[in-house]
Amino acid sequence: MALTTPSGKLIPELQFKAHHFIDKTTVLYGPSKTGKTVYVKHIMKILQPHIEQILVVAPSEPSNRSYEGFVHPTLIHYRLWLADKQKKNDNKGAERFLEAIWQRQTMMSSIYSRVNNIDMLKTLYHKLPIDIQQKENKNIAKVECLKAEQTDQKKEEKITSLYQQLLKKIIIQNIHMYKNLSLTEDEKFTLNYINLNPRLLLILDDCAAELHPLFTKEIFKKFFYQNRHCFISMIICCQDDTDLPANLRKNAFVSIFTNASICMSNFSRQSNRYSKQDKEYVEEISHIVFKGYRKLVYIREDEYRQHFYHSTVPLPTAFSFGSKALLKLCKAVYSKEVVIDKSNPYWSKFRLNF
């Protein structure tokens, strides 16, 4: 339901959808106990059907246990580097941690791109028995026709993605048919990883002190500017808008403000270079939006060109984020003393290697 200011300006309500957050950077601003974690969990719930992997860095987790019941303990880090690489006064520990994630996601992205090659998927499709192809050819032809007629680049990309998913669905449904066929190495590789979901959700919750030395580092900029290429969805929680430098603040796709004063200071700050119109609009709507549990959401590249929304989300109920395979692996390496048993044979398969 839209809100209306005394001057008649409308503030639409935003219903969060997965496309707002997938492969994008979201930043939440607000002091402690203003609802940031409630919003993070709501976003996690929305992303759960689309992302199977998660890493959380939350220095305050040992005391507030915000993610207990939502994220397995083995996927929560209290500092920005892994326990087996921690060194006293190790200023590069956090940088190595992020580099390890980036390298892993780069490889995942490469494998995903190789597996989703249209020509390879079509080749595998045409290796299926004729009766199966005849059954599916009508749907395939419809999508191919739509693709050929499309002139809009964005719509063409969506149709290409639909085409890929349709081919993959047919191949997966009939994957047993390939068992006795003569296949190339590339075809075997595609079939082996055809179910790969490369996406990762990275949550950095109140890590300002550890993040600060990384702001000028190339690796941290990659997470902001190139994360979509490596299928990384990133959520950062900040106490204040100054916890991030202006160039990074402006590049966040979604900004959520849980407190009126921080919202006002962000949009009035000269370094952020918001237009006079935006500043005046925020000043007017802030007095209306921040009542009860309502928050202000700013979408940088909004398809509706509205950009500003109000939002209220429900309190989260417990759920375990991650695929069944990931949670099974977490259970296998978990130690109740919060120290991972590195003699466990599963540990070498699970850890991030620097």
UniProtKB/Swiss-Prot annotation:
SUPFAM superfamilies linked to this entry: P-loop containing nucleoside triphosphate hydrolases (SSF52540)
Give the family this protein belongs to, as stated in its UniProt record: Belongs to the asfivirus B354L family.
The protein in question is named Uncharacterized protein B354L
